[in-house]
């Protein structure tokens, strides 16, 4: 019985690590929301800047 409990604990720890990774993904989602707000501004300033410059900057940020 004790050995079985140890295995269940290791499994719960691995699940906790996966949840932590999901939390880090949530932080990335927040930055993605911010980039979306900026993208709206970029649409308004399309004439002033070239598309290539913006695409390169976006790739550098990610």
From Swiss-Prot:
Keywords: Chromosome, Developmental protein, Differentiation, DNA condensation, DNA-binding, Nucleosome core, Nucleus, Spermatogenesis. Residues 1-62 are annotated as: Disordered. GO terms for molecular function: DNA binding. GO terms for cellular component: nucleosome; nucleus. It comes from the Eukaryota. Testis. This is Sperm protamine P1. It comes from Dasyurus viverrinus.
């Amino acid at each position: 019985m004790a050995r079985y409990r140890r295995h269940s604990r290791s499994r719960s720890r691995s699940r906790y690590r996966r949840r932590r990774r999901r939390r880090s993904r949530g932080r990335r989602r927040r930055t993605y929301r911010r980039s979306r707000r900026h993208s709206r501004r970029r649409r308004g300033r399309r004439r002033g800047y070239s598309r290539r410059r913006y695409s390169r900057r976006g790739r550098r940020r990610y």
